[in-house]
Amino acid sequence: MKKLLVACCLLSGFASTSVLADAAQDLQSRLAKVNSFHASFSQTVTSSDGAAVQQGEGELWVKRPNLFNWHMTSPDESVLVSDGQTLWFYNPFVEQVTATWLKNATGNTPFMLITRNNANDWKQYNVKQKGNDFELTPKSSSGNLKQFAISVDNSGTIRNFAAVEQDGQRSSYTLKSQQNVAADASKFKFTPPKGVTLDDQRQ
């Protein structure tokens, strides 16, 4: 399920509790300005020593709070879809689909933070702000995420985001051509293709 985490950038700022709270509130309010959007993205994954691990690209559709479709098209195709209840992860290369309840999805993955924009999720982080750049550090060190950063302007448009894992690996995403339009409902529906293995974890 590590690819589920691959979704997610930058900089620091202030330190007082009130400032941290204000930064979190500002980030939430910015993201809340856009309820539905489509964008293409480029991905860069680097190791802890800065060496290039992977370059990729794909498309993203979001309808907050619980609908999204993350389609990685290269170098290997993968699809992550939420229909509002079930989280579907499809890897065509290995012909396998994993299904989990969305309500059980952890709030400590960058992509879930962006799409849900849930107040309870943000409470799990210390948030610092410098202009349009927000840096999030988990209050708990038990998860795989070490740091998450996102750049979002006053209109709610996401420019880029990145996640740094505990081992130092960094996954950076740059969004392009964001269009704040309602996506077709079919983008948020998923039916496992015939012949694939279904790992249903909703039991």
Curated annotation (Swiss-Prot):
Localization per record: Periplasm
Under InterPro entries, the record lists: LolA/LolB/LppX (IPR029046), OM_lipoprot_carrier_LolA-like (IPR004564), OM_lipoprot_carrier_LolA_Pbac (IPR018323)
Which superkingdom is the protein from? Bacteria
Give the record's keywords alphabetically. Answer: Chaperone, Periplasm, Protein transport, Signal, Transport
One GO term (biological process): lipoprotein localization to outer membrane
Q: In the UniProt record, which is one GO cellular component term? A: outer membrane-bounded periplasmic space
A Pfam family this chain is assigned to:
LolA
Q: Where is the signal peptide?
A: 1-21
CDD domains per record: LolA
Function (record text): Participates in the translocation of lipoproteins from the inner membrane to the outer membrane. Only forms a complex with a lipoprotein if the residue after the N-terminal Cys is not an aspartate (The Asp acts as a targeting signal to indicate that the lipoprotein should stay in the inner membrane).
Family assignment?
Answer: Belongs to the LolA family.
- Assembly and oligomerization: Monomer.
Q: Which HAMAP family match?
A: LolA (MF_00240)
Q: By what name is this protein known?
A: Outer-membrane lipoprotein carrier protein
